[in-house]
Regions:
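An aromatic- and histidine-rich active-site surface loop
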Residues: 57, 86, 100-122, 127-129, ...
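Short hydrophobic beta-strand element within catalytic cores of glycosyltransferases
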Residues: 308-312, 322
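Short alpha-helical donor nucleotide-sugar binding micro-motif in glycosyltransferases
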Residues: 268-269, 276-281
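Conserved acidic donor-binding segment of nucleotide-sugar-dependent glycosyltransferases
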Residues: 323-325, 329-336, 343-351
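A short, active-site helix/loop in glycosyltransferases that binds the activated sugar's phosphate group
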Residues: 152-190
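Nucleotide-activated donor-binding/catalytic signature segment of Leloir-type glycosyltransferases, i.e.
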Residues: 251-269
Length: 388
């Protein structure tokens, strides 16, 4: 049941409803952005959050920071999209008397909720556009009209890089609404996290270099390419953190290649263990294979610990985050041999890893500051609401 008190607010604070698919402790780039948005306005505005119930089993209630989250009952999914009548009803109730609705795309359920809600034009609507829908082409037949309607109705569209807007099939007519706000990362949060040798302790050969992958085990992440490339490397072990639909097939392929001693499937782990893994690895690999990977925020989580990154030359912001020859290496998507060559180079050259790692940390501090991201977003909100 929705807490009726969440509609009350201090007179000097504007009120925001953030509607997303998932929220922390669910792990992912979009979830990280949703938390960053909350943190940007938490002390200056009243934020309430509507999401679907996720895999972590968290209940509706308040966060430690006092932010109200309603986790709608989600009985099933179609094409990875949650279906929830509870979400639609909660959106209508929670959007009452707010000043601003913050949405995320692509997410058909929240778009439908906005369409059915038909709230006053006085309520400003902002959208964080993460990427086009890439895989579920059949879904787009039904979703496209709703997405186009929603893009017309929102007052502001945020993207993490100009390339996301320029490569999109749907944002071209709405560039006047687009504002670029690069994702940020809080170096302070990562610096104060406990560090322990979570990967080192699991090594089969203590002399091996530790390679890390973190992400959902889904098609566009390119984890299958990474597994194949690992068969062409020596002197290293790969740690795979995350779960997803490809879990069993990846383990089977690892067994077929005879490299089970080189690959550790760790599944989903707690946040403190995840941060320890980033700090303990020697380098990070993001082998994504198509535009569904629009930014690769996870790269920053490795870079903040001074770790070099191998990424792919996608026509998105991915290679703009970690720069080839400066903070790591960039290879062609789906190119097993090129990926293996890049990994072998970093495996064999400790000094190169150190040099890239130093540059990676500096790039985080200079170009991807969480405080700068949040300041820019809050200023945009004030302008949108006519308070600036």
């Amino acid at each position: 049941m929705i807490d009726q008190n969440v509609t009350k607010s201090e007179d000097n604070k504007f009120k925001i409803l953030q509607a997303a698919k998932w929220y922390s402790p669910e792990v992912g780039g979009i979830e990280t952005v949703a938390v960053a948005i909350t943190d940007a306005v938490r002390d200056k505005a009243e934020m309430k959050i509507l999401v679907c119930s996720g895999n972590k089993g968290k209940e509706t209630g308040y966060t430690d920071e006092g932010v109200y989250i309603y986790r709608a009952k989600t009985p099933f999914r179609i094409c990875s999209t949650p279906i929830s009548f509870d979400y639609l009803g909660a959106f209508r109730k929670m959007s009452k008397d707010v000043d601003l609705i913050q949405l995320h795309a692509p997410f058909p359920l929240s778009d439908l909720a906005l369409f059915l809600g038909r709230r006053s034009r006085k309520i400003k609507k902002a959208l964080w556009y993460h990427s086009d829908v890439i895989k579920q082409r059949k879904l787009m037949f039904f979703y496209r009209p709703l997405l186009k309607w929603m893009l017309r109705k929102v007052d502001k569209i945020y993207v993490a890089s100009r390339s996301i807007a320029e490569q999109s099939k749907y944002l071209g007519k709405h560039m006047d609404k687009v504002e670029v706000i690069p994702f940020g990362i809080s170096t302070r949060e990562y610096d104060k996290a406990e560090r322990f040798p979570i990967l080192t302790e699991a090594l089969n050969d203590k002399n091996n270099v530790k390679i890390l992958f973190v992400g959902r085990l889904v098609y566009y992440k390119g984890i299958d390419v990474l597994i194949e490339a690992m068969a062409k490397t020596s002197g290293a072990e790969l740690f795979v953190i995350g779960g997803g639909e490809l879990d069993e097939s990846l383990k089977k392929r690892t067994d077929e290649l005879g490299i089970t001693d080189k690959i550790h499937f760790m599944g989903r782990i707690e946040k403190e263990e995840l941060l320890a893994a980033f700090s303990d690895c020697d380098f990070f690999v993001l082998p994504s294979v198509n535009r569904a990977e629009c930014f690769g925020l996870v790269q920053l989580e490795a870079m903040v610990y001074g770790k070099p990154v191998i990424n792919t030359s996608l026509p998105t912001a991915v290679p703009e985050v970690s720069v080839h020859g400066e903070t790591g290496l960039t290879v062609e998507p789906s190119n097993i041999d090129e990926l293996a060559e890049a990994m072998n180079l970093l495996i064999s050259d400790e000094e190169l890893r150190k040099s890239y790692g130093i540059n990676a940390r500096k790039r985080c501090e200079d170009s991807f500051s969480m405080s700068k991201m949040q300041e820019k977003l809050y200023a945009s909100y004030l302008e949108l609401l006519g308070k600036k």
